Amino acid sequence: MFTKKSAGPILLGLLLTFATGAGAQEGGKSGRLTIEQLIEIKHPSDAVWSPDGKHVVFTWDRAGVANLYVANADGHGQPVELTSFAEGPVEEAFWGRDLQTVYFAHEGHLWRATIGGVGAKAAWTATTSSRESDFVLSPDGTRVAFVRSRASDEDAARKSTLIVRTLGDGSETVAAQDNVSIRRPIWSPDGASLAYAVGSRTINHDETPAYSGKKIIYRTWEYVPGQIFAVKIAGGKPVAIGSPVEYGGLAWVDATHLVYDGESKDFKKYSIYVANTAAGKPREIHSITEEQFWSIPDWGEAGAQPWPSPDGKWIAFLSDQDGWDHLYVMPSGGGEAVQITKGHFEAWRPTWSHDSTRIAFDANEPDRPGDRHIGIANLGGNPAHATVTYVTAGNGTNIEPHWSADDKYLVYQHTDTRNSADFFTIEAKGSAKPTRLSDSMPAGIDKSQFVEPQFVRFPGADGKPVPGWLFVPKNLDRTKKNPAIIWIHGDGVNQNYDGWHVQRNYAVYYSFHQYLLQQGYVVFAPDYRGSIGYGRDWRNGVYMDVGGKDAKDAWMSANYLKTLPYVDSDRIGVWGLSYGGFFTLIAMTDQPNLFRAGVDVAGVVDYVMYYSDPYHGGWTASRIGTPEQNPQVYANASPISHIDRLERPLLVLHGTSDVNVPYLESVWLIDEALKKGKGELLSYMMYPGEFHYFTRAHILLDAWHRVDDFFAFHLQGRIKDAH
């Protein structure tokens, strides 16, 4: 229980950190937000147009439970639920040729659901001893390619088969087999060939001691890049496509050529290659050499892979060679690359129109880095004469546009200060009005209670201005000194937005901060160096300095808050997830009396350990080299080495199935804290089976109430009445 002396002893296993119940109900006042309400906010993803442009199917996630929905593209009516699964992801959705059937992957098999039908069912009968994945529809819509492997994790990486199945009669053809896993098959434009990757392997993450006679084992698939094959469906031997680099994105240019990109082993050179699938030999058509390291987030986030036009004439890609992430286009056969977007902003996620004349993308603004808008580059047959038109405007974050089949409309995701992520459609021209497809906010939430952030800058570690977002509670008594909380975002290469975060993993934290604002806290969220949205130089500011000036930028937010007359400089808390948890640990040990209390959610405790895990070695080495090359840099990035300096209460939260930051890191932190006599300052909760980003409702409910209780006691001097 709480005492004046400490935050209470460490409690391992499933014991409650506090004597008070962490899952009790909050609120009750009219218009007041509750944790329970905020957990009900859903997050949409993976929108797919129907071929006739009348519908959009998408995944809607509620606290880790994902299901498939279909919406009318004109916005009429409410989205209709196509599936009702209680657990397990819903992925890789695509439409059938009848325009009524939607296929999707669920728990190792292909399923199908029908618009207007009842429930979903397996697309075909599959054995329980096998799992199927990586489903992709052929260009003519008659066949599906997928990977079949053994169902057990132990055997899955040993042998896999690339299958082509005809949807009409169910006949199957074996396209390729390998003794290691096959991944990411993609069809050639003519439907005659498949390209695929070979070479993922299992990494056994550190094992925990046995609890209650059981052992929890951490295991994840790590993709080993650089092994590409192409194969003719009608028969023939797979052709190995050579790659001088560890490749990233892969796409067909035409029926006989592939394009892919990759980075050199020292992470300084980025190259684009085109390979003839008959010969297998690649040719470099473009390269960029960086002084520090290539840092545009990978193809899954920024869309920073080469994107060939549907007609095969052009390749679009992203480059930061002028200091900002911009859209470029070059001939697919090689030649001069033309910069399409220009200015002090970042353009991401390009996508070609089906007629190859336009590219849609999203970009932020020079004076509003937390907003993003959908732009369209009209090439007019010549990239050198391209014109750019923006189709969205105003405050908010609009991302990830996708063209309808007739190229007349776009579907995209939108967030702002009153709305979490939702899908909208808009006509692909200027001055069009968007149409809302979904509403992810529960009806009982009073949106007028939400606090809009103010964009500010403050002096950082070396005097450079650090951007950040200040949230001041509504009706705050500014004549008094009030407690404050600093939130440090994770990933390093991420940012805060002008409203709800675009990613579900961070949107849940934005929601919780709206609750904390109603509890009377001023909240501040810095975009420390290393963050995206502010150009290459700011993003690369972590080079050979992880845990240095970037961490100082974060904890120096407290110095800024102290300049505000309504903030109590003695009642400032700090917390963060992942990279933000790492910074929290640095702040609590490097500046032991700056913060009254801190919360570390799955933070890295030592970068030597983090580097030694094969799942993270490349990311770490690109920024700070290896421990042998730069031992002092790694020593600075090791808050566990300074845990003896801890003077204020620290709450640590971590999921046991975390593969981003292995759970063992927090176990090691607790062990070292005990050895240094700091046990009475630490409170701890582990979440069985939870991943890095907390997703499940019961986990979020416990974690948010636990953090609420922790800050209420240490920053406000009270135990929550409702608990």
Residue map of PLM features:
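Bacterial N-terminal signal peptides that target proteins for export
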Residues: 1-10
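Bacterial N-terminal signal peptides
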Residues: 9-19
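A short helix->beta-strand "capping" segment at the edge of beta-propeller domains
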Residues: 27-44, 79
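Beta-strand-rich domains and repeat architectures in extracellular enzymes and scaffolds
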Residues: 36-66
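Blade-terminus and WD-like Trp-Asp/Gly-His loop motifs, strongest in beta-propeller folds
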Residues: 47-55, 93-100, 135-143, 185-194, ...
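A flexible loop/linker signature enriched in serine peptidases of the S9 family
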Residues: 59-69, 84-90, 102-120, 125-133, ...
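Short loop/turn segments that connect beta-strands within beta-propeller blades
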Residues: 72-76, 114-118, 166-170, 232-236, ...
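Serine-hydrolase catalytic core recognition
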Residues: 251, 261-263, 390, 397-723
